[in-house]
Amino acid sequence: MKQLWCAMSLMAGSLLFSVNASADTSSGALLQQMNLASQSLNYELSFVSISKQGVESLRYRHARLNNQPLAQLLQLDGPRREVVLRGTEISYFEPGLDPFTLNGDYIVDSLPSLVYSDFKRLSAAYDFISVGRTRIADRLCDVIRVVARDGTRYSFIAWLDAETKLPLRVDLLDRDGETLEQFRVVSFNVGDNVSASMETLAKANLPPQLSVPEGGDKANFNWAPTWLPQGVTEVSSSQRRLPTFDGPVESRLYSDGLFSFSININRATAASSDQLLRT
């Protein structure tokens, strides 16, 4: 769980592409099939997650048992770190910390946010561009770019298994086309044998639910940004106090369904100096 705090955070963009409507429609349909396959099939993925912080080796298993989702994300190297999804409960297990449970629909840790996006919503601000086929993990894949039309956000490239539509690789790119993060499958398995291997998790006792504090006092602010990127809407607003600030901080959280950012305002005083906090 990460809280985004910034004075203003703008999302960098990428190259723009011109494509015809039929190409966008078919690519969008493939992405929607990826979303459905990721949440309905019984499968196991061994993958690496690469970012500026380093490389992680992980295994993700997903199944549907008794008409509810069951998933496990396991770190394969170093200390055992595990995340378990059962129904709408997500439990975290990590050495040195008490295990706890939160409410949620799917595991997002180390998995690309693109997989669970609402592509019908994203189609209002993004182009979905087919760039051909290639092989990943010895599987033929459809390759699709996801690019914001106004050039204000990062872009994605997704490699979808041509048969199952599961994501086998997803790259997050900056505006210069440099890879910031990469999710890359090295082996995977699809079938009922995956659900059979997870039956013990379905019966396991999960840790207690963590009490999550309220997001702050609800408030109607007398300020608002004069410009927002296309497709971005306000998700929530709150007011709270932070140790490093005098007086309350007013916060608005925005999202386009794929990327999120917040704008936080604190009333200036005579001793205040200009500062920009960026996340």
Predicted regions span which residues?
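Acidic/charged, solvent-exposed loop-and-adjacent secondary-structure segments enriched in E/D, K/R, S/T
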Residues: 92-114
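N-terminal mature ectodomain segment of secretory-pathway/periplasmic proteins
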Residues: 23-96, 126-134, 140-155, 162, ...
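Gly/Pro-enriched, hydrophobic low-complexity segments
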Residues: 137-206
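Cleavable N-terminal signal peptides
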Residues: 10-11, 21
